[in-house]
Amino acid sequence: DRLTIHLSKFYHIHTILGTENSNELLREIGEYLYDLCGKFHVFHTAGDAFTVFADTKEQCERLKCEIQKRFESDWVVQENRIALDMETVVQHYPTDFKAIAEYYGMREFLLENAGKSGAQVIVEADADMTAQYRRRRKVEIAVARAIREKGFLVYYQPVYSLKEKQIV
C-alpha cells in the first residue's frame, strides 16, 4: 500500500520563507515520516510530495491517521510557525495499480481530485476511481496513437429532433 502526502501550495511557502527555510521544513517533515515509518519506507518523490510504503492495510490506516493528526498542528522553522495543508492519496497494490507507470498516473489523477476537495483531504482509491482513471488513460492512449499515426478522424453526427423536426 502507498500513501502519497502532497503539500498543497508549498510554492507559496517557498516564496515567503525562501529556499533555505523551505528546505529545512522539508527536512523536518522527512525526519518525522522517517521516525514514524522507518528506513526504506519513506521517499521524497517530488519537491512537495512524499510517498510512504506500508506493508499492510492496517499499517496504512494507522499511518494515515497519525500523519493527518500531525499535520493538524503547526511546523516550526526558524521561529516561524507554519500551518501546512496536505492532500493524502492512498493506493493499494495490486487492486489499484499493477505497474509503476500506472501508480504514478493514478496518483496524479487522485491528487487532481483531492485538490478539488479542499485542504487536509484524504482520497483513497476505490474501484470506481480506478475504473475512471483507466477509462481516461485508454482515451489518452487512443488519441495519442491516432495523432502519431495521422489517423485521427473526426465525424460529425447531426442530431435530428423529431419534436422540432430539425437538426439541433
Residue map of PLM features:
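Output-coupling edge of small sensory domains
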Residues: 73, 89-91, 157-159
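A short linear hydrophobic-aromatic micro-motif
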Residues: 39-41, 155-156
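Flexible, glycine/charge-rich interdomain/linker segments that couple
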Residues: 85, 94, 113-138, 155
